[in-house]
């Protein structure tokens, strides 16, 4: 059970970091 919790926290952290980086620099992706 603990493994599932730790995996969920790890995925959640990575998702938050990815979202922060993605929404911080949207022009670089939209400009082509």
Swiss-Prot record:
One of its GO terms (cellular component) is chloroplast thylakoid membrane. The keyword Cytoplasm does not apply. The chain crosses the membrane at residues 3-23. InterPro entries: PSII_PsbT (IPR001743), PSII_PsbT_sf (IPR037268). It is found in: Plastid, Chloroplast thylakoid membrane. GO terms for biological process: photosynthesis. It is a single-pass membrane protein. Belongs to the PsbT family. PSII is composed of 1 copy each of membrane proteins PsbA, PsbB, PsbC, PsbD, PsbE, PsbF, PsbH, PsbI, PsbJ, PsbK, PsbL, PsbM, PsbT, PsbX, PsbY, PsbZ, Psb30/Ycf12, at least 3 peripheral proteins of the oxygen-evolving complex and a large number of cofactors. It forms dimeric complexes. Found at the monomer-monomer interface of the photosystem II (PS II) dimer, plays a role in assembly and dimerization of PSII. PSII is a light-driven water plastoquinone oxidoreductase, using light energy to abstract electrons from H(2)O, generating a proton gradient subsequently used for ATP formation. This is Photosystem II reaction center protein T. It comes from Guillardia theta. The gene is psbT.
């Amino acid at each position: 059970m603990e493994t599932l919790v730790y995996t969920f926290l790890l995925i959640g952290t990575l998702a938050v970091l990815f979202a922060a980086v993605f929404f911080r620099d949207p022009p670089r992706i939209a400009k082509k």
